[in-house]
């Protein structure tokens, strides 16, 4: 049996939310964790010892999903209040709000380059937004029930979505068409995601199952029935060799995708577990659930996967039918001589969890523009400028390769407002002016279209009148 040092351990726990935790994500530099909750708040936790936590207040209903941008300078959140917010992670609470859907928003996901954002909603639609151009791009409509999750592929060319209509769909982002469809007659998927190299998808099912699909051959590769209740979330290890799942049965389970078996059951939560996520380096994973706790686990097997995945691939020709070797790099595994599952229950051990309830600072959302139902359309049209949905230019991600922005390693590292080159009051005034100009431009455009239609109808009337006169003259 492997030594204890090779098994995952509970390293820390955080308490601060007042209700169930719905989503969690590590920052790209692995120094912070953001969590979302039924209490309508987001919280930002530092992994530094004795650091304070920040509670972000802005949503008016359950926060269902969140994700850091790849650059780490923004945090996107989705809520049952039908809004998506983009947060700048500082003490000012600056965020921008836009209403992209007509029903609760279930998930948000950035593309790998940070230039696109995909949202999924209970209005049965998936919407894609450009962060660089600040524009709504397009909608995807094929689901017939609530869409629970939508994710970009690693290369950004595909989107996978799952719905309560019991289907999983693959979308081509170039032609905006559904190119693949997986159906299930038993249950629906609560969560879906691509593996790190984008050749497979994994689904977390309401039927207690975890399934791995090959999207090139439209084929089910692996099926795991390891939970006794619905599976709510899953996360691939960055190298793709393993998968961690969260379930309403109160456990987090780790699967070895090379050997196709369950290797660990992590028990630390009281009640259902709703979210789980690996850190970007694979050394840590976090879980959250109905007990409002955030648990941080150290995986302790990163050294087992440290070899270059490309060198571990055995197959070099991909024209033939796919094999798991095409999908996951084969690496040495510490449990080759053991087939039983290890259950890890930290409650049985005495552990130093380093201030599980750190001091919390409330950060109220600050919006420079207040929108009412009369100032926006709930569902923007294709190509509509959504500049007014963003707080100010300082919120927009810098996509230029010549611009280097400091990553927010800690909230305290963010420069104060006095150091900004554009005063906030001036930015507010300019944004208000731009909003009014945008409305005027749209109004003029609509008037021009109506005038053109009126001219066309008048021309048709004159032509019909002339034809009528000609007919009357011929009869007389």
Curated annotation (Swiss-Prot):
Keyword Cell inner membrane (UniProt): no
Record Gene3D superfamilies: YVTN repeat-like/Quinoprotein amine dehydrogenase
InterPro entries: G-protein_beta_WD-40_rep, WD40/YVTN_repeat-like_dom_sf, WD40_repeat_CS, WD40_repeat_dom_sf, WD40_rpt, WDR55_POC1
Modified how: Phosphorylated in mitotic cells that may be mediated by CDK1.
Residue stretches in coiled coil: 429-468
Chief location category: cytoplasm
Keywords on record: Cell projection, Cilium biogenesis/degradation, Coiled coil, Cytoplasm, Cytoskeleton, Phosphoprotein, Repeat, WD repeat
GO BP term, pick one: cell population proliferation
Subunit relationships: Interacts with POC1A. Interacts with FAM161A. Interacts with CEP44; the interaction is direct and recruits POC1B to centriolar microtubules. Forms a microtubule-associated complex with POC5, CETN2 and FAM161A. Interacts with CCDC15.
Name by which UniProt lists this protein: POC1 centriolar protein homolog B
Organism: Mus musculus
Biological classification of the source: Eukaryota, Metazoa, Chordata, Craniata, Vertebrata
Gene designation per UniProt: Poc1b
